[in-house]
Amino acid sequence: MEQYGFYFDSERCTGCKTCELACKDYKDLGTEVNFRRIYEYTGGQWNQQADGCWHQNIFAYYMSISCNHCADPACTKVCPTGAMHKNADGFVIVNEEICIGCRYCHMACPYDAPQYDAQKGHMTKCDGCYSRVKSGQKPICVDACPLRALDFAPIDELRTKYGTQASIAPLPPTDITQPNLVVKPNKYARLSGDTSGFLGNPREV
C-alpha cells in the first residue's frame, strides 16, 4: 500500500480560501460542511516603552487543513459500524450507506475532518479526491490553489522533498494520530501546544 499525503506551504498561503471553495463546489457541499478549512492563527501585542514609543510583536499566519488520512486515525477506532475506515490505498473514507450519524468520529478526530451532513443524516469527509488520484490527477484543492501552496503525493516522496514538520499551531502534536501531512512553517509559526496565539476565525472553521 502506497500511502498518500498532503503538503502545505504556510509561507505561500494568503488565506484566500480558493482551495476550500473549490472543494465545496466539486463535492457539492452545503454551507455547513467544509472538507477543507483555513485556520488563521494570530497573536502578539503592542507595548508602550518608557520613551513613549510603541513596540509590537504581532503575528498571523494561515493553515489549510483537511483530512490527513492518518497512519493511526482516531476516527476509525470509535466508529461503531465500521463505516469510517482506511481503505487499501491508505485513504480514510466513510461508507455513507452504513453510517448512522452518531458523530463519534467527529468528536475523536483532532483535525475535525469528519463532517456531519444534516441533509444526508450521516457523516461525510474529505476522501482525498480518491477518484481523481486514481486517474492520475491531484485533489481539486491542490489544483485550485493560485499560490501553489498545496501538494499531494506519496507521503514518503513529500517527506524526502520537504521534511517531516507538521506539528504547527493550532494543529495538535503529530504523535496523536500520525497524520500524513508535511507543513512548511510560516516564519511566524508557533509549534503545536503554543498558547501565545489564538484562532482568529473560529466561526469560519
UniProtKB/Swiss-Prot annotation:
Which InterPro entries does the record associate with it? 4Fe4S_Fe-S-bd (IPR017896), 4Fe4S_Fe_S_CS (IPR017900), DMSO_DmsB (IPR014297), ET_IronSulfur_Cluster-Binding (IPR050954)
Organism of this sequence: Haemophilus influenzae (strain ATCC 51907 / DSM 11121 / KW20 / Rd)
Question: Could you describe the subunit structure of this protein?
Answer: Heterotrimeric enzyme composed of a catalytic heterodimer (DmsAB) and a membrane anchor protein (DmsC).
Classification via SUPFAM superfamilies? 4Fe-4S ferredoxins
Q: What gene name does this entry carry?
A: dmsB
Say which domain of life the source belongs to.
Bacteria
Q: How is the cofactor bound?
A: Binds 4 [4Fe-4S] clusters.
What this protein is reported to do is described as:
Electron transfer subunit of the terminal reductase during anaerobic growth on various sulfoxide and N-oxide compounds.
Recorded protein name is Anaerobic dimethyl sulfoxide reductase chain B
Annotated positions binding [4Fe-4S] cluster 4: C79, C99, C102, C105
